[in-house]
């Protein structure tokens, strides 16, 4: 269901929108002090704008499957048991807001590895995140949590992590990035707590930023893409806004679903190449081979040539090999990004790589949408959407 049909079915939408305005008038008087309280930084007062008229908002789960444990369910047993019980797993969680007079295509914001949709909601220092920025710009916005994390939950039952009686549904271990790895790997600075001199990272929100990242279980791209395709089937044509590892998932979702009308990708990784045309792995400083994204059949890859794609990359990516893997990976991944764009365009597509320093914007991290200049970065996305005819009003 697209945003236009959603607006049409809600008879009380105008009343709801009025309530949102009245509530917003109250909240706008306190929002600044709340943001400052979150971080202890008076500068966090900036960035909270006027009230927004929202005609519909909510959340739902979509996609996934169900597993049933062998045995017979016995309701008289007091202790928790999987026997004979069914469990929904591998669904996606989406929350959405639809503004008055929404544009034709909603934005679906997809988080990266070890993260959740909270990365789009607000910045670590309490400023408005992309969810609100683009809501203000007239887009319906859907923010998701992948299957197996966040509000979508993960497949675990009664007992050992991920085990349904004697069947291991997901591996019995998790992964998580620590503060030190996060600081260097997301390019806040070359060493822990040593910021790049020109950094745009909101330093007052560092503690909040570390808490954005959560433990993860195995990411299965088929499970994630299945869920994204189910979401797109439900909401209709949309624009995907991806980050980091979800750059690949956005591409695979576009291959799977004709409802993807464009992709804006913030430092995405592992984009696919056609079978037989993937670039060779590249050696890192220590000799470790870093490969490109797994290939897909050419007929699938060609579907990516039918939509506009923009990959946005921040600053402080080394130009020469580095002994620290967290700094090496962005250097090598940038090479693969360039090759992906070249390959799409060689087949007649419309892909572009936007290096922020090339347009005079410096100091951005791996997550430019959270940085101090995220409004400036958002302006570039708005320009791209306008140039590609993706910001038309819904009629």
What are these regions (language model features)?
Residues 363, 367-395:
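Catalytic active-site module of serine/aspartate enzymes centered on a nucleophile-bearing elbow/loop
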Residues 240-241, 263:
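Conserved alpha/beta-hydrolase fold motif
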Residues 40-102:
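N-terminal cap/lid segment of alpha/beta-hydrolase-fold proteins
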Residues 101-166, 170-185, 321, 327:
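Short, surface-exposed "cap/lid" segments of acyl-processing enzymes
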Residues 270-347, 352:
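The feature captures the conserved acid-bearing segment of alpha/beta-hydrolase catalytic domains
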């Amino acid at each position: 269901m697209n945003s236009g049909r959603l607006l049409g079915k809600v008879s009380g939408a105008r009343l709801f929108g009025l309530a949102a305005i009245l509530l917003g008038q109250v909240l706008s008087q306190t929002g600044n002090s709340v943001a400052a309280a979150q971080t202890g930084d008076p500068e966090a007062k900036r960035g909270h704008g006027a009230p927004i008229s929202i005609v519909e908002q909510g959340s739902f789960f979509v996609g996934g499957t169900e597993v049933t444990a062998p045995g017979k369910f016995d309701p008289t047993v007091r202790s928790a048991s999987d026997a004979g019980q069914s469990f929904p797993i591998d669904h996606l969680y989406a929350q959405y807001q639809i503004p008055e007079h929404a544009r034709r295509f909603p934005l679906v914001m997809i988080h990266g590895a070890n993260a959740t949709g909270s990365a789009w909601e607000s910045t670590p220092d309490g400023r408005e995140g992309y969810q609100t920025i683009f809501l203000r710009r007239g887009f319906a916005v859907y923010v998701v949590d992948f299957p197996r994390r966040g509000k979508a939950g993960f497949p675990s039952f009664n007992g050992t992590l991920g085990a349904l009686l004697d069947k291991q549904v997901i591996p019995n271990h998790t992964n998580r990035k620590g503060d030190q790895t996060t600081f260097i790997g997301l390019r806040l600075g070359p060493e822990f707590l040593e910021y790049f001199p020109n950094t745009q990272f909101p330093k007052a929100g560092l503690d909040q930023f570390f808490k954005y990242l959560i433990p993860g279980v195995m990411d299965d791209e088929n499970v994630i893409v299945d869920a994204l395709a189910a979401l797109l089937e439900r909401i209709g044509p949309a624009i995907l806004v991806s980050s980091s590892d979800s750059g690949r998932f956005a591409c695979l979702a576009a291959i799977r679903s004709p409802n993807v009308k464009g992709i804006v990708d913030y430092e995405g990784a592992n984009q696919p190449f056609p079978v037989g045309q993937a670039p060779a792995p590249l050696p890192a400083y220590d000799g470790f081979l870093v490969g490109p994204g797994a290939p897909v059949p050419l007929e699938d890859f060609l579907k990516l040539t039918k939509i506009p794609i923009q990959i946005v990359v921040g600053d402080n990516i080394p130009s020469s090999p580095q002994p620290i893997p967290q700094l090496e990976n962005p250097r090598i991944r940038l090479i693969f990004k360039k090759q992906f764009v070249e390959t799409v365009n060689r087949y007649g597509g419309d892909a572009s790589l936007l290096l922020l320093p090339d347009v005079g914007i410096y100091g951005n991290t791996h997550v430019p949408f959270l940085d101090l200049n995220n409004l400036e970065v958002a302006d570039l996305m708005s320009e791209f959407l306008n140039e590609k005819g993706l910001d038309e009003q819904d009629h």
